[in-house]
Amino acid sequence: VLDNLIVQNNLYDYTSTLGYSVENRPILVSSFGSGKRKVLLWSQMHGNESTTTRALIKLFSELTLKKSSLLDNLSIKVIYQLNPDGSNSYSRLNANGVDLNRDAIRRSQPESKLLISLFNVFKPHFCINLHDQRSIYAAGNTNLPALISFLAPSFDKSKSINEVRKNAMAMIGNIYKKINPEKNWSIGRYNDDFNINCFGDFFMSQ
C-alpha cells in the first residue's frame, strides 16, 4: 500500500530503501530540499498509527509539486513507516513484539538501529516524531478530545529546559499560532515525563 501511495503521489524519485524490518519489509526514506537546516521526520513507529504517514505523503506531494521555497531552505529526510511489520499486522509492536519507542537505549531491533544510524549520519537540527492519539486524551482541562497534541520532550527527570528544548517549544508555539488563530481548536500538550528509552527523549538528551 505504501509503495502505491508513494508512486501515486509522485514521490518515487525522491525515495530509496533505508533498510529492512524484522520480516524483511523495506523501510523507505525520502529526501527533499537542499537547504542548510536539516529536519528528520518519522512516522509509524507504532504500526497501528497510520494517520501521519498519509499526512506526510500528502504534504510532500504538494510541496514538491508546487516547488515550495521551503525546500530551498531545508534538507529533509522522511521515514514514512518505521514499523512496516506492525503496519501489516495492525499492531503497535514490531514483529518481535517490541515497542520501538522504548528501544532507544537497547537498540535491539533492526528498525531502531536504522533510525539511530540515519540520525547519526544526517545530524538533523530538528527531529519530528509523528504518532496517532486516541480520542480518550483531552485538551487541557476540557472535556473535548485533543485533535492534535504537541510535545517538546524532556532530556532529564527534572524536565529542565536547555537551548535545544527551548527551540522545540518555540517552534511548537509558532505552529500553534499558525493553525489555531482563533484559539477554538482542541489542541493538547502531551505528557513530558522523561523516559530515556523513548526516542524523542533520547535524541533530546544528545
Which residue stretches match the model-derived regions?
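Active-site-adjacent mobile loop/cap segments within catalytic or ligand-binding domains
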Residues: 189-206
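Active-site/substrate-binding loop(s) of hydrolase catalytic cores
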Residues: 36-189, 193
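Flexible, active-site-adjacent loop/turn segments at secondary-structure boundaries
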Residues: 16, 20, 85, 98, ...
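Short glycine-biased active-site loop of nucleotidyltransferases that positions the nucleotide triphosphate
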Residues: 31, 89-92, 201-205
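Alpha-helix C-cap/termination motif
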Residues: 8, 121-122, 205
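Short glycine- and acidic-rich boundary segments immediately preceding or forming the N-terminal edge
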Residues: 1-26
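Short beta-strand-to-loop junctions in surface cap/lid or active-site-entrance loops
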Residues: 28-36
